[in-house]
Amino acid sequence: MQRFVGFVYQEVRLHCSQGRAQSIEITVKPHGGIRGRCSRCRRPAPGYDRLPQRRWLFVPLWGIPTHFRYAPRRVECAEHGVIVEHIPWSDGKRPVTCAMMGFLARWARRLSWQTARAFQTSWEAVYRSVEWFVQWGLAHRQLRGVESIGVDEIHWGRGLRADNFLTVIYQIDVSCRRLLWVGRRRSQATLRRGLKALGPEVVKGLRFVCSDMWKPYLQVIAAQVGQALHVLDRFHITRHLNQAVDQVRRAESTRLRAKSKKAAQRLKHLRWPLLRRGSRVRGRARQKLNALLASKLATARAWDLKETFSHFWKYKSVIWAGGFLDYWCFRAMRSRLEPMKKVARMLRAHEPLILNWFRAKGEISNGAVEGLNNKIRVVTRRSYGFRTFEAMEIALYHNLGRLPEPESPHKFC
């Protein structure tokens, strides 16, 4: 325990409920022979009276929440008058001790190799501990009730080699979102291994599968999860539209720059405003965007097609949504913009799967796949020391798997 000059620990109580420890309450009292100090000048002063008992959160002991209890004294300082005494474990009126605030702040930024240093052990010991923790969780996790999964690929490492991609399978039910499986490469064989790892009972019980338009995934899902409603992720479609608009902008910018620098200025600093949703563009970017839309440039027509397509997701009827999709593809094919025509051909080729999004509305967590992908990117950025797939796999399960944990009396974070 931490020692504080002028104070002693009087009593320690363990509060239990239903046979389990709930909290540790430590009563603190002032030392009998030492005066309290003014909280402003820190000089000793005679006592005046006592305030009601307060409670501060301290560093947990053995995984049990720990609190200090103390009734602060007021002292009569010659310079500052009657004032609350200086409390060495506290800062102002905060209900958390300074030790606990430092503890939380350090753990909030701590990485795995720093954990090894903090507990005076090796990186290998930390890694093996996490590996055991993940293996225990995978062996004891329950997969009953999984009805919706998302399948996606994630780029990992440097370069675009096949080994630098991961295939991930998520549970995306509204009630639960977690990582179920991760494998190396983005091939049919990889996805087959992932579905096999889930087990035949889980695969047969699936009602919805969400994926992008990667052909190997589409083929495996159709062959092995045919009973489930296959939905194409709307965020991947939006990404294709944004890429098409950016291709039109870059091609037109090159063409205008060849004519004159002044003409090319019309598209300068417009990349990100063009890729954002129109309703979210504000200020000077909005003014430049409005000036562009008033022109007859190809980029303005491409942006208009992209914004028009956003209305597609607002439909509730599959029939009306299908009619809008046909109308939009008709416009795109006659826009004389090859990137937009390419998107239109892609949407027509996958129209049944795109319309399944409306049939599954409310049944799966929309945007869950992209949200979990973002969390994976956070883990990869934070884990610069993970240079092998095995270490990366352990890190992803540990952070996103929502795995059960073995019982332990020591839970510090």
Can you describe what each PLM-predicted range is?
Residues 30-35, 70-73:
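Short metal-coordination and nucleic-acid-contact micro-motifs, chiefly zinc-binding Cys/His arrays
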Residues 35, 40, 46, 160-163, ...:
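Acidic/histidine-rich catalytic cores and adjacent linkers
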Residues 42-46, 51-149, 153-160, 203-204:
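Short, positively charged, Gly/Tyr-enriched micro-motifs
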Residues 84-87, 175-181, 355-356:
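Short small-residue beta-strand/loop micro-motif enriched in glycine and branched aliphatics
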Residues 165-166, 242-254:
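Short, surface-exposed amphipathic charged segments that create phosphate/polyanion-binding patches used
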